[in-house]
Design a protein with these regions (language model features):
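Walker A/P-loop
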Residues: 70-92
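Short, well-ordered loop/turn elements at secondary-structure boundaries
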Residues: 70, 101-102, 152-153
Length: 153
């Protein structure tokens, strides 16, 4: 049943108010569930300004396959400025840790500074309100360094 199609006009005002709150909660839960299980939905939820292209859908499908275990290895080759680093080095680790809080991820980049930068971005995302609406994963208080952090789970 679609909650938005239910006629609530004849209900008492306090019940209408509760029903409207339930609609909002239901919509938020649907967004949360989709973002937990679909990488591109996660991206769109935490990055509202994101502009989606066909190549994003393709790589997101591969990331979903990687997360589900359908594939175990993935090499990503894309031209510069096509969101490869944002997806693979920042958003994917945050999404994967949300799905599997005990997961260990090694970030390999051509400089240590770049790996720390991506680690810092992922850490800030995991500490954000937007992320908390999707995943219950939190970081340990004593391990919040940009280059090395652990979840509390």
């Amino acid at each position: 049943m679609n909650l938005n199609q239910v006629d609530i006009s004849k209900l008492p005002s306090d019940v209408r108010k509760q029903f409207k709150q339930l609609r909002v909660m239901h919509a938020e839960k649907k967004i949360q569930n989709k973002a937990q299980h679909d990488f591109l939905s996660f991206v769109k939820t935490v990055w509202p300004e994101f502009i989606e292209g066909a190549h994003h859908r393709h790589i997101a499908k591969k990331f979903n396959d990687l997360a589900s275990g359908k594939i175990t290895r993935l090499i990503v080759n894309m031209p510069p400025r096509h969101t490869k680093s944002e997806f693979a080095s920042f958003l994917l680790p945050a999404w994967m840790v949300g799905r599997q809080p005990k997961l260990k991820i090694i970030q390999a980049t051509h400089t240590g500074e770049l790996a720390i930068r991506f680690g810092r971005k992922a850490k800030h995302l995991i500490d954000s309100e937007e992320y908390a609406k999707i995943f219950k994963t939190t970081l340990q208080e004593d391990s919040k360094a940009a280059g090395r952090w652990e979840t509390s789970q």
